[in-house]
Curated annotation (Swiss-Prot):
Gene: mdtB
Organism the protein comes from: Escherichia coli O157:H7 (strain EC4115 / EHEC)
Protein name listed in UniProt: Multidrug resistance protein MdtB
HAMAP family: MdtB
Topology with respect to the bilayer: Multi-pass membrane protein
UniProt keyword list: Cell inner membrane, Cell membrane, Membrane, Transmembrane, Transmembrane helix, Transport
Amino acid sequence: MQVLPPSSTGGPSRLFIMRPVATTLLMVAILLAGIIGYRALPVSALPEVDYPTIQVVTLYPGASPDVMTSAVTAPLERQFGQMSGLKQMSSQSSGGASVITLQFQLTLPLDVAEQEVQAAINAATNLLPSDLPNPPVYSKVNPADPPIMTLAVTSTAMPMTQVEDMVETRVAQKISQISGVGLVTLSGGQRPAVRVKLNAQAIAALGLTSETVRTAITGANVNSAKGSLDGPSRAVTLSANDQMQSAEEYRQLIIAYQNGAPIRLGDVATVEQGAENSWLGAWANKEQAIVMNVQRQPGANIISTADSIRQMLPQLTESLPKSVKVTVLSDRTTNIRASVDDTQFELMMAITLVVMIIYLFLRNIPATIIPGVAVPLSLIGTFAVMVFLDFSINNLTLMALTIATGFVVDDAIVVIENISRYIEKGEKPLAAALKGAGEIGFTIISLTFSLIAVLIPLLFMGDIVGRLFREFAITLAVAILISAVVSLTLTPMMCARMLSQESLRKQNRFSRASEKMFDRIIAAYGRGLAKVLNHPWLTLSVALSTLLLSVLLWVFIPKGFFPVQDNGIIQGTLQAPQSSSFANMAQRQRQVADVILQDPAVQSLTSFVGVDGTNPSLNSARLQINLKPLDERDDRVQKVIARLQTAVDKVPGVDLFLQPTQDLTIDTQVSRTQYQFTLQATSLDALSTWVPQLMEKLQQLPQISDVSSDWQDKGLVAYVNVDRDSASRLGISMADVDNALYNAFGQRLISTIYTQANQYRVVLEHNTENTPGLAALDTIRLTSSDGGVVPLSSIAKIEQRFAPLSINHLDQFPVTTISFNVPDNYSLGDAVQAIMDTEKTLNLPVDITTQFQGSTLAFQSALGSTVWLIVAAVVAMYIVLGILYESFIHPITILSTLPTAGVGALLALMIAGSELDVIAIIGIILLIGIVKKNAIMMIDFALAAEREQGMSPRDAIYQACLLRFRPILMTTLAALLGALPLMLSTGVGAELRRPLGIGMVGGLIVSQVLTLFTTPVIYLLFDRLALWTKSRFARHEEEA
């Protein structure tokens, strides 16, 4: 029977050691809560950190970019600019479309922003054109965020107009109602309509004008209230044949009489069922299609949203004819799930490696089982807290748990090793557990709170980067805290029941061999340490040199923002000469599609041509290239992009810009490349002067590639210069001229056909097949005040000019965005510095302002706060350690280990060819928390030896180093092996995880080697400094 030690021993662990059943049930409760939490947690690629973003689209067919800007965009911008919480407002006004993107502060709820946007639209309504076909429509979506799912709808038997009509009413509307869906767009422009193509010669011969025809059509097709009759006994509702539903009915419409004979619409026009906009088209691979892009609301969970769509699709497609085929071309969640699965596998691998290293050191199965239980229990218990905090299972939280594997095992190792030491000395297991746990309790608390202190600054990081890493930091802190609880409760209790002298002394051939090996290593370390302690100043110079080297490496290492991920989807923009027509652009697009589809890595392709709010001009096309799964192709996305661009370069007259889709989207505009730089001015003339000059210089920089600008001011314009005096004599107003031009060439929506399920438009235009180009203007006729017909050419001259194809604003002022990529041999930091240096050489006037946008702006912000972040982490840890040790000196000794970690991490990143990005910086901050553990374990035991055994400082620190060498080596290797799977990651999303693993493994290796020698030396030097300071104070007091 064991003799129990006094109740004063055991510290906070005593209660749990003495009550094994209660302790076991408590741990089972933590385990069950964690399992339930894991099943309840949503899955996503990254924490939901989107800015509240709303897009407002206004379509005004036929309007020029200048008209769209002044008549539509500007009135809306003035109202939006008064909203509180607005962070940034950008707009793009192109031919027939105005798109305004509103980005709000992170703290503003999206629903509140939505209410403000609706109120602003209502306030601007009276200022918008009266003939606007539809009011502005807003969507809770970020246009730069790639669609979560892309579907292609094709048919071999039905025209695209019928296909779109069915898809819009039976599929798109239902998907739009799913929670989390922000916007469903149908690209392809095949919305059904009745098209009226006037024969200009025919109406001129009859003395009619297009305005006469328009008035007749609008008056013949109405759908308004007619009232009802309420008699003594019955009520009767009035109805009439005031609606015309088909093209045949419109052909028979009488628009005028001549000599008593009716003139029907079919006599002067071709009337047919067609598409509302004939200058829009979409293709899936090589087949014309209706392409359905589904975008999520900012903040919505992408996995649950996509799952809901997948569940609904079968029942939606069942209602479609068999000839209509719906194909899912891309689903971003496929790669997100694969990335999360790979990270979970790496987490399991880290746990396995950590348990193996524990067995290697302890050489005892019962002793290995104890941390083998503590590690998964700590990690699983974290899931319960994550649910409470509304977190998700994503790459960052799983990375935090993977790194935590090496952290949480440290506490268990320290406890087991200390208890085992007493058992080997002959203590009974229960007494050894009480004594060892009580002795090590303060060390565990010190390790835990000093490590959590490192994570505190991450919680105060600003803007979107801070939001991004908040889940990472809190998840890691929770795992560390639960680990400390488990190590002070379950671990000593299990040691008291599972360890014994017999089990610890029981050895096999492997354990004997490993024991001898560790003894030789410790002996060699002891000899080396003795020599180092005899040459303290040389060792101190080494420590100082690591500090200097870390600063130099920090200055010269390439810096980036966020790793470029391979998500298997490439977004592309195809650019042609500015005067390109829709037919010309469609032909070029098909040529490029043929080239792209020949690449062995490409699985499918969707493309779109036309102006509809997502594409700014007719001379550009949007492409989405879906790659095969990563395990089915030989190259990663960057190599595929380079290969595709080389292949497309052979297609004449086009430029192709490609960029891989990313899980983290900070931009608010669809850009041609990954990074953006803007020039903003008070006028378009200023931009037209300086943009070409800057572009010329930027295109010569080797630090950037694929440089392009959205400044397109060479669009062909036929300027109708009306002689106002001549027009006035004939009684013709400028409104008459505009109406005649709009009727002829604006695809004017002049009437609406109402049905029970949908509404369709009647489109008026001139038939220009026989009079292409500017010659079509000669066919325009106007009605004079005396009823005569006057040709436009008699009162106006046609001048050919150039004008912008689109006009862009940023916060209500004209802006141009310059897009660029960064070549493989340069970093984003190099590119940013080169652009800033180039800008300075131009001496831009004061009314021109420049700014980086999107991820480049976030990079500048993150880079500027990084040094302060690290300083804050060090200060926080110093404060915690100072409070715990009640000393100003000992925390400095502990923190002296930090430069070695920085040197190792930065060297590893440079050797691996990785940039110092935000992921790597987080790794360095975590290293600050890890490497100081070595010093804490040494100093704790040295102080105890001085205080309790009366040892000299040199003997105390020497014995502490030898005594704690094995647990120090175990904990460091455990942390290293926890990060190793991340460093060696090769699967989906590996780009995101690898920098963290590389930095941590490199930092741990270098710091392990150096701190075992530098820490004891610095401990002794500070001890001497303290003694010298005390003697000086004592001397001054005696003299006084």
